[in-house]
A protein has these predicted regions:
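Conserved glycine-rich beta-strand-loop-beta hairpin in the small C-terminal domain of fold type I
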Residues: 200, 218-230
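Short secondary-structure junctions
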Residues: 212-220, 249-255
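A glycine-/small-polar-enriched, mobile loop at the entrance of the PLP active site in fold-type I
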Residues: 1-2
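Conserved PLP-enzyme active-site core in the AAT-like
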Residues: 6-193, 197-218, 241-243, 289, ...
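Conserved C-terminal alpha-helix-loop-beta "cap" of PLP-dependent enzymes
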Residues: 225-306
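Short, flexible turn/loop "capping" segments at secondary-structure junctions
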Residues: 143-145, 221-223, 279-280
Length: 313
């Protein structure tokens, strides 16, 4: 934990049970009491995070962080003492810069405690939330080639100390071989993710060739939770593509998002938060995560799946 705190230039760190969800829960518990107000981005909240919020009966105050011009008005409410930010986008048109949002909040109200959900962002961005001025960052080490079910909360010592008191029981703590597995994962995860990013760039370049792939309307990279390839089709064939791709060797569901168990590419529906913003995307868009596969493998599966649909039609 001391090593991880040093990696992220933080005062302290604790490994938690319950992966990223557990880390977020403890981050909230360190600073918020039941029935208090919590400031969040005006967008669909990640389902497991929403469960944490509902279980404490927190009063959710929404603000669109894509436009900071009226943030001062919202923060005039002195009952708002805590803000939860998500590093990756929650809806397709999100454009806010996390660093700017944190700086603006602190400029207006330095007393507001900020917890950043860095799931899907850690080791993919130059700085996580606690390095940008937030009190806490929470993420899953399972998504970084670490052990199953282990999360990480890193940031201010005062708040981390509270969480350590919550976990005074030895059975609740992460230690021994599990803690070592976290460190092992963190040493290679950046390399693995960098290789994956190169494959994603190759896929965008190749699949953007309209004359070669006329059935594809648009293709782009997005931090739709993980940094993935979003492929929009001209026809409503997304669900069929996913079904065919599974038979051709693709994963139909994530197992922790880029965990050590995921080797084939993932052909999957767009995230629930994206679907809440536009339900029709379910029928014409998919997300593809290469995982440990190369661009050629992804294209082969996509092309074969589409041809299979065409031959059936």
């Amino acid at each position: 934990e001391k090593i991880i705190a040093e990696i992220f230039k933080a005062e302290d760190c604790i490994l938690t049970r319950g992966s990223g969800t557990g880390a977020l829960r403890y981050g909230i518990l360190s600073s918020v009491l039941p029935n208090e107000k919590i400031l969040v981005h005006k967008a669909p909240i990640y389902p497991t995070t929403e469960l944490n919020i509902k279980s404490m009966n927190l009063k959710v105050i929404e603000y669109d962080f894509n436009d900071l011009s009226t943030l001062n008005d919202t923060l005039e409410d002195k009952e708002i003492k805590f803000c939860l930010l998500q590093h990756t986008r929650q809806k397709p048109d999100d454009s806010y810069d996390l660093s700017e949002v944190i700086s603006k909040i602190k400029e207006i109200r330095d007393d507001v405690v900020i917890l950043v959900d860095d799931n899907y962002a850690t080791m993919k961005v130059s700085k996580i939330g606690c390095e940008l001025g937030a009190e806490l960052s929470a993420f899953s080490t399972f998504k970084l080639l670490g052990p199953v079910g282990v999360g990480c909360l890193v940031g201010k010592k005062e708040l981390i100390s509270k969480v350590k008191k919550f976990n005074y029981s030895g059975g609740a703590q992460v230690q021994g071989y599990e803690a070592m597995e976290v460190l092992k994962g963190l040493t290679y995860a950046p390399v693995s993710l960098a290789i994956q990013a190169i494959q994603n760039e190759k896929l965008v370049e190749e699949l953007s060739k309209k004359e070669k792939y006329p059935y594809i309307k648009d293709v782009f990279l997005a931090n739709a939770q993980s940094k993935v390839l979003l492929v929009e089709f001209n026809e409503n064939i997304a669900e069929e593509i996913i079904e065919k791709a599974e038979k051709l060797g693709a994963l139909p569901n994530p197992v922790g998002a880029e965990s050590k168990f995921e080797i084939p590419p993932l052909f999957y529906k767009v995230s629930g938060t994206f679907l809440k913003s536009d339900p029709t995307l379910k029928y014409r868009m998919i997300r593809i995560n290469p995982n440990r596969s190369g661009a050629d493998t992804v294209i082969r599966i996509l092309e074969s799946a589409y041809k299979s649909i065409q031959s059936k039609g």
